[in-house]
Amino acid sequence: MGQKIHPHGLRLGITSDWKSHWYADKSYADYVAEDIKIREFLSKGLDRAGIADVVIERTRDRVRVDIHTARPGIVIGRRGAEADRIRRELEKLTGKQVALNILEVKNVDANAKLVAQSIAEQLTNRVAFRRAMRKAIQSAMRQPQVKGIKVVCSGRLGGAEMSRTERYHEGRVPLHTLRAEIDYGTYEAHTTFGRIGVKVWIYKGDVVGGRRESEINAPAERRGRGDRNARPRRGGQRRQRAEQKQEG
């Protein structure tokens, strides 16, 4: 089951949070359709901005949209002109006041959606699919929080007449473990031979007691050789005592 189902939907409320934060009684279906239109508008209009995630929060008379992007300068524009244009378009779409927040994604190589988009852009530029996949895997595995990655490309790879699926993975990607923090992203590459689908799974450790594995291991990693609070080794104490006895 973990191999087929969407990793984000399977872990809602466990390791992942909802992408839309609002409550509605009678207008629930209208809000869902509106959220889909907002995300489609942003993904099509800002395809070069590297949008990783869009979080929507609603109140009675206001809509807040958080855009997580790898290139915030493209979304903001010169002197905020592009951000103002996006806000006006969203206000026309929703009929309410829109608060737009633009957040930068600092670690691009550890975000599944951005990794999938990077591979798709390389395939569009006629880069060999194996080279693009391996390069993305190597870049992701260099990140300290990434424990494993799996990449799948499907379509007319290399311009072949018959479509096929190629898979590459490195490290652990436990899709059946509910406490595992799995980041999942997809993207489509539009080539002269047709569309090629790219899927990426990134495993970032387990979530124990509401805390991520990277947050738990961070204090232990900080305590290194140069840390003054680190406990001295027993061997060093014995050596000091032996030297003091010899001097005495």
UniProtKB/Swiss-Prot annotation:
Residues 38-106 form the KH type-2 domain. Pfam families: KH_2, Ribosomal_S3_C. SUPFAM superfamilies: Prokaryotic type KH domain (KH-domain type II) (SSF54814), Ribosomal protein S3 C-terminal domain (SSF54821). GO terms for molecular function: mRNA binding; rRNA binding; structural constituent of ribosome. The keyword rRNA-binding applies. Keywords: Ribonucleoprotein, Ribosomal protein, RNA-binding, rRNA-binding. One of its GO terms (biological process) is translation. One of its GO terms (cellular component) is cytosolic small ribosomal subunit. PROSITE patterns: KH_TYPE_2, RIBOSOMAL_S3. Residues 214-230 have a biased composition (Basic and acidic residues). Binds the lower part of the 30S subunit head. Binds mRNA in the 70S ribosome, positioning it for translation. Belongs to the universal ribosomal protein uS3 family. Part of the 30S ribosomal subunit. Forms a tight complex with proteins S10 and S14. NCBIfam families: rpsC_bact (TIGR01009). This is Small ribosomal subunit protein uS3. The gene is rpsC.
